[in-house]
């Protein structure tokens, strides 16, 4: 609660920053209020374009995620001086994406493709060696010699001693395969683990330790009434850290793709997550009350196949989710809205009167053998393999959702744009969205198209709820992996992407794209699993590679002709988290955090001297 009021106090300054000229630094209030910030997978999928006016922005201050994005994107302009007094950040040459540290999480450990670490910053105005941390799940079965989740602190160059150090590491009694989510103050973690083959929600309070490691974690599965250990749901709120509580999903399903999405709105304390049986679950009392799964009409029936990670939009009241294609029943590759609040109830989108728990699905967006249920007919091949569909990106301000499909059933990779308003005139039952944009060829072997990201032209667009800018995505899933730019004009998506350049000389999978803006440079980061780009700056021959590109800072600017920086990584990377929250002044850096897909390591890499 204290951190919420800190964020609320910060919003006036943050809103002022939003309309400040880029060329003139804005100083925060002299009396410094500590603002903590959590960043996890969900902040990549729920975004906000710039509101149309100051007054509209002030109305958005009731949405904690909007404020978090303001802080995350504007904090580089709030440094209290222009020096680097502690030597935290060292200038590096342009093009040098330096691996600051890598840590083994155990043999075979990985976050997994399309999954993310989670970062907590104790104070967005300064680095904190003791309290800033980044958490990784390992994707391995927990045991006395293998952590299922591990966090690192002492993260930064200049912290002294061992960089980093293990902050805490736990044997939680299961296998965590999807991204974790953090409470707003960073003191708790929520995640899904497979426990005896069944999906289980875990809510955990951590405690810093000097003795735990990836190979010697603390076992907190022993039954307890007060902690440390596993406590009942009723005893969780009062338990002493480290402690956790577990809730088995209703129906005993599995969950291999869906990560939990937490609603930070005051008074909500609700979390949503999907399962492999096509149901969407709601949990209440997660970080502030008594954790419990909601009953009827939850879990909501969306489909009969695996769900992606859900994204809740507080404006429309809908939870948006995608379904992956499953060949066993010729189903999936759809986008769906599930009504979660009274805001979306009572209308008819072609499937009867919507109530809380009602799902409104699109037609099939990918390959299928049944043309009558598909947006593009049976088209090209690809209907004989399963196809994962990533979680959508939702721009709550603009009222649009973006869905990324590696095969649209007609021979192309595609990005679909949908309205977040569910009714017969916008997103209707069994519709195909407002626009379909193609980004190269479509995979017939099940290579997914992971989510892209918008550039700062889009995020800072002055056109309010009708933003103009660009969406970058790594497509061409049936050929050499290729970076594309998709133009968005007044909230309308172009129907085809502009080819930027090939990022691999092979038919390989890209990671999601992650954008990071500074006062003078807008960068995007992505990785390929093999045969990375060979132009300047070149990736190691034949290897997986993470790379950055300098993208135009103005509409219609010159597209990059090569990478800005590269780093060889084993088998490519997970999703990438950007840490733009430490601002020493004119010397600043972008930390990126990720895991390798085959090298068993957690990595922090930095690129400084951006100005």
Residue ranges: model-predicted function:
Residues 1-4:
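Positively charged n-region of N-terminal signal peptides that target proteins for export
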Residues 8-20:
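Bacterial N-terminal signal peptides
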Residues 19-28:
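Sec/Tat signal peptide C-region and signal peptidase I cleavage site
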Residues 29-36:
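Cleaved targeting-peptide boundary
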Residues 31, 54, 63, 69-611:
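Mobile, glycine-rich extracellular loop/lid and propeptide segments
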